[in-house]
A protein has these predicted regions:
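Extracellular/periplasmic periplasmic-binding protein-like sensory domains
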Residues: 250-324, 391-411
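Hydrophobic alpha-helical
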Residues: 114-125, 231-253, 326-327
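Solvent-exposed, acidic/polar segments of extracytosolic/periplasmic ligand-binding ectodomains
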Residues: 26, 33, 350-411
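Beta-alpha junction/loop-to-helix N-cap segments that form part of ligand/metal-binding clefts
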Residues: 27-28, 34, 47-54, 66-143, ...
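Extracellular/periplasmic ligand-binding modules, especially the Venus flytrap/periplasmic-binding
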Residues: 196, 240-243, 292-351
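Extracytoplasmic ligand/sensor domains, especially the bilobed periplasmic-binding protein
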Residues: 90, 105-209, 258-283
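Short, low-complexity disordered leader/linker segments with a strong preference
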Residues: 1-34, 408-411
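Extracytoplasmic "Venus flytrap"
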Residues: 29, 33-57, 83-89, 112-113, ...
Length: 411
């Protein structure tokens, strides 16, 4: 009996080695490192969920085609195990548990949105599973003391602060009147906090502070108030659907405002969807193809834009670019750790200091990227062709800001 037991233990040990992972090691089968991801393929975040998945997949293919990930003198390829989180926080948390407990995944990629990242982070943290995420920008993610969460993007409160600074500058340095309407999700509320901070810093006044409806399909009540009280700047954050709704109703109601600052213009393909109706909208972005960052995998932003467009038949929004950057960060960390031990790779992630086509990546103590500023672009049209032009920061600007926005009667 004892001999049989010893033999079974030996067989199990060999089997575990062949599988290539233990309780502290990444899911490695042969020469494949499997990462886990729950992304929104259905539900209200499905558009950006698709961008996220496409960004991950493009980087996986590029890294694998260029020799993969080198650990211990051997080359490994990336693969991603996907599930649809249905744009639902509870489902996202359940899938994180499933990926870790049932599928044996030891390294995670983030979902789309701050809310879903917030749902998954406690699960990955409890299990000491590193998660490199690209689409959860809420600053509250980085104040929880998480040690296994790393975000390649800039925090949400930084998205539109610079728009208020620009409005004040264009107002001769004097405070401005601000109207704002926000979705009630974690990301948008953090953008709102950034606006409140900017208003306080510049002594500007918030004259409208509205909540967007849950379905993001009507903001006429807010726009009627804007027409009545005439703010200097209108700020809107409601993910892709909110951006499209805002432009549609602003044009229908002929709402004149000197500055319109928004989020998710590129993810919603605003310039393409609404054309000249979207002209002069000022948009926060984590990335733009014209920026000068470089790496050895995608070259620069223009090359990434070309490669992504060839693969998926549409131009990449920043949600795709930052998702690709997450894979480059993982590759770098695995190779510096020279190990599949989760703690060693976690420690390597914490010491990340690199440049990618998307931007510089260096993590603060809370896991946020401290090395990359936001950019602002403005939708500009020549004839019927509309595109995004970077207007801030000045060092990357490809066009001058048009301010104030011409009234609808003159457009």
């Amino acid at each position: 009996m004892k001999k049989l037991l010893n033999r079974l233990v030996a067989i199990f040990s060999i089997f575990s080695l062949l599988l290539g992972f233990s309780s502290a090691q990444a899911r490695v089968d042969g020469d494949v490192i499997t990462l886990g991801a729950a992304v929104s393929l259905t539900g209200k975040y499905s558009t950006n969920g698709e961008h996220t998945k496409n960004g991950y997949n493009l980087a996986v293919k590029r890294i694998n085609d260029m020799g993969g990930v080198k650990v211990g003198g051997k080359s490994y390829k990336f693969a991603v195990k996907y599930y649809d989180d249905e744009s639902n926080s509870k489902r996202a948390a359940q899938l994180a548990e499933r990926l870790i407990k049932q599928d044996g995944v030891k390294y995670m990629l983030g979902p789309y949105s701050s809310g879903l990242t917030k749902a998954m982070a406690p699960v990955t943290e409890e299990n000491k599973i590193p998660m490199v995420e690209a689409n959860g920008a809420s600053r509250s993610l980085f104040t929880k003391g998480y040690k296994y969460l790393f975000a390649v993007l800039s925090p949400a409160n930084q998205y539109l602060e610079v728009a208020i600074d620009l409005a004040v500058e264009k107002n001769g340095g004097k405070p401005v009147k601000i109207a704002m309407a926000f979705e009630q999700d974690a990301f948008s509320q953090d953008v709102r906090l950034g606006i409140l901070d900017a208003a306080k810093r510049t002594k500007s006044k918030i004259i409208i502070d509205d909540k967007l409806p849950k379905e993001l399909n009507d903001m006429a009540a807010t726009l009627a108030k804007v027409k009545a009280v005439k703010p200097d700047v209108l700020v809107v954050s409601g993910h892709s659907k909110g951006a499209l709704t805002a432009i549609r109703q602003i044009s229908e109601m002929k709402v004149d405002v000197p500055m319109l600052a928004m989020t998710h213009c590129d993810a919603s393909k605003l310039a393409k969807q609404h054309g000249k109706k979207a002209e002069y909208a000022l948009c926060a972005s984590q990335w733009h193809k014209s920026l000068s960052y470089k790496d050895n995998y995608f070259g620069g932003g223009l090359k990434y834009d070309k490669d992504f467009t060839a693969a998926y038949k549409y131009a990449p929004p920043y949600q795709a670019a930052e998702s690709s950057a997450a894979l480059l960060v993982y590759k770098d960390a695995f190779e510096r750790a020279n190990s599949f031990d989760t703690k060693k790779v976690r420690d390597a992630l914490a010491k990340t200091n690199m440049q990618t086509f998307y931007g510089n990546v260096k993590f603060g103590s809370g896991g946020q990227n401290t090395a990359k500023p936001m950019v602002l672009f403005q939708v500009r049209c020549t004839g019927d062709k509309c595109e995004n032009k970077v207007v801030a920061p000045t060092k990357w600007a490809s066009a001058k800001l048009v301010h104030p926005i011409p009234s609808w009667s003159k457009r």
